[in-house]
Amino acid sequence: ANYTKMMTEERKRSDEAWEKALPIVLKEAKEGRPYISWAGRPYDLPQARIPSFPGAEGGGMYSFGGRGGKVITVTNLNDRGPGSFREACETGGARIIVFNVAGIIRLESPIIVRAPYVTIAGQTAPGDGVCIAGESFWVDTHDVVVRHMRFRRGETKVWHRDDSFGGNPIGNIMIDHCSCTWGLDENISFYRHMYDPSEGQYESKDLKLPTVNVTIQNTISAKALDTYNHAFGSTLGGENCAFMRNLWASNSGRNPSVGWNGVFNFVNNVVFNWVHRSSDGGDYTAMFNMINNYYKPGPATPKNNTVGCRILKPEAGRSKLNYKV
């Protein structure tokens, strides 16, 4: 009941913010920044000609983010209101979010990013930077760049069991130098896009499309909370996606779990101290490029069980088809 009430209220607030943002999004679409909510293949989303920033790699490296848009400065640590991080995220139009404050932003409800073309530049914060705590941060759009941020979901409102950083992402997503911990479902997950086909692009009423053109690099997913016997690291996947130079540490499972078929690129990562699952998921159509990763058992890893030596466990039985190959 608490969860339903909170999410009903937050969805209403998010819808109100989206109603204000949408005219700006549509205006900019006519000026060359299209809003493509129905994207389900990598080529559905235009990409930039130069990387999002020096050092960007992988499928999301050509995300536009907020390039060329307005600069919005976060001036306080409030949950909502003028100058807040939430208000900047919910604003319409291409935008680059910078900070002149440092500290912990304690959320009372999830932040839902619905307007595309945004760069969140956590490295602009002074001091020890910015931490988003107490609730989830959701990306429900495309062309998003998030750098140098900390997401600490934490054991608050335990009846709302969700990720520290996740959402319903469409594509052109670049995550770099972020730290995601204390999730109640997973710490950070990007793998699918649930699409409402009201725009008429598809006929189906219930579509699960891949997230496309995604990179997570130089990022930490660690110490998921075991409140529900569900201390999991990540579910990742999609089309034209890459996950490199990341650390998964002290999560019982899903380090990470592969949440889509096709090609899964997993390179130069470290996985430490898993319990009953290291890396897993996908199905018999998945193709895994797992290159130069370091798996190190820790104090919680079983020493006398095959899971302690396991690198990957594909889940062939997940397929809903009536045949196997």
Each PLM stretch: what is its role?
Residues 58-64, 109, 165-167, 282, ...:
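Short aromatic-glycine motifs in intrinsically disordered, low-complexity regions
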Residues 1-78, 82-96, 106:
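Extracellular "leader-to-stem" segments immediately downstream of a signal peptide or signal-anchor
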Residues 78-79, 102-104, 124-126, 298-301:
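Acidic glycine-/aspartate-rich tracts in secreted/extracellular proteins
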Residues 117, 122, 126, 142-153, ...:
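Right-handed parallel beta-helix
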Residues 1-27, 34-37, 41, 258-325:
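Extracellular beta-rich repeat passengers
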Residues 86-93, 104-119, 130-147, 153-170:
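Extracellular beta-strand-rich solenoid/capping regions of secreted or surface-exposed proteins
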Residues 73, 164, 255:
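Conserved beta-strand positions that form and line the central face of beta-propeller blades
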